[in-house]
Amino acid sequence: MNVNLMWFRNDLRLSDNSALHFSCRNNASTVLALFIATPKQWERHCLAPKKKMLIYKNIVALKKKITELGIIFYYYESTDYLESTNYIIEFCKIHKVTSIFFNLEYEFYERQRDKIIKKKLKKNNIIINCFHDSVLITPGSIKNSYGKMYKKFSYFKYKCIKQLQLNIPSCFPKPQNKNLHDHYSLDFTIPIFHTYLEKFDANIFPIGEDIVYEKLKFFIKYAFNKYNFDQEIFELNSTSMLSAHLSIGVISPRQCVTLLFKEYPDIIHKLEECKWINELLWREFYQHLLYFYPNIGQNQSLYHWENRIKWDNNLYYLNLWKQGNTGYPIIDAGMRQLKQLGWISNRLRMITASFLVKNLLIDWRKGEEYFMSQLIDGDFASNNGNWQWIASVGTDSMPYFRIFNPMLQSKKFDINAKFIRKYIPELSNVSTYNIHNPCDNNKTNKIHSKYPQPIINYYHSKKKTLLVFKHAKCSNKL
């Protein structure tokens, strides 16, 4: 009898799961499920404690759901990726596994792990079935006239939209109940991961695919039409708040798109104008880039001129930025929200990142690493791509001379300073003008006795950065 092993990784759901769907397609086969936790490896990758807890909670929910389908769920905690490959081979031998099914991951070390496990599986005559499941469109199917990956998002987006319009995505259904035959039910509690974890707000980041899917339905039905106008505002209800669940595969991008098309059939002809689709396609773009340029995962940018940038890398300033004590209220409110909630809006990510790189002249990699260590929705491809974009060193990045002005951003997106006052209570009684203009108080350069004065002058730092980046770029042409 055939025994199929479903290896869960970054795809913690039953519905629309390519590998799970095909592992269960043959009713005559026995299906086993396995998840391997690698907390030490996660620590090396700076995975946020809140995200590790989100993974744990959703693994517990997944085990319950898949057991109800008659599929036995196994759990193992490994020291690292290499040790996990050894465990899988032993598992396959013990349970007489004939085929293994899993969804691909594009990060550098995950691909190295898969390369190793594929060799071992082939050596043991185990059939390998792997799928591109975390994206809307298979990497490699969107190419330029030279047969290569687009490095400009606008071209990539145009091609993606055309493909989505021609081939509307469909979702795989949840598998039907399996017959356990002579297998017995494994009744055990998944032990807590052996690593530092932090609690998160389950009202904002719910647990389990059914509740998350309901959250998606609510957003599309009641909040989607406001997204084009509210997306840049800092309030939580201005976005879908699904990024954390997309990052660990509790929900798929296909589910997002198919549900949107179902609710608004005519939107398929207006995808270019849809900001939510735009955000999903940025995520897609960075996933495809990582697939084609795996060295991005090794602290490298695609353009070598950035190696000539002379970073200040002031560790004192870096720590003040992390703590939310720069003296720029919008920066500090964003960094404090990141620390407390494990999430900040896309606009705030750009503002705070620009300040670190373009005003404090600190290497973007240090900011990238810190964000990963805090974000409950930390996704390597998107986080890396966004940091390279803001630092003007990645593909299709903004020009190096574009630098976000935190005062103007503050006035535009937090008009009444409601967000700032929420996360910086010491400024609760300070006037909105002074909050938005921390550099304009000529007497003390301080807007409150308990709040720090600006650590740098924005305008002076901007001039310095422009010179440093211009020199690095011009030197590259010599």
UniProtKB/Swiss-Prot annotation:
Main EC class the enzyme belongs to: lyase
InterPro entries cross-referenced by the UniProt entry: Crypto/Photolyase_FAD-like_sf, Crypto/Photolyase_N_sf, Cryptochr/Photolyase_FAD-bd, Cryptochrome/DNA_photolyase_1, DNA_photolyase_1_CS_C, DNA_photolyase_N, Rossmann-like_a/b/a_fold
Binding positions (FAD): Y227, T239, S240, M241, L242, S243, D377, G378, D379
Transmembrane annotation, as ranges: none
Residues of the Photolyase/cryptochrome alpha/beta domain: 2-136
Keywords: Chromophore, DNA damage, DNA repair, DNA-binding, FAD, Flavoprotein, Lyase, Nucleotide-binding
Record region (Interaction with DNA): 279-286, 346-347
GO biological process: DNA repair; response to light stimulus
Protein name: Deoxyribodipyrimidine photo-lyase
Organism, scientific name: Buchnera aphidicola subsp. Baizongia pistaciae (strain Bp)
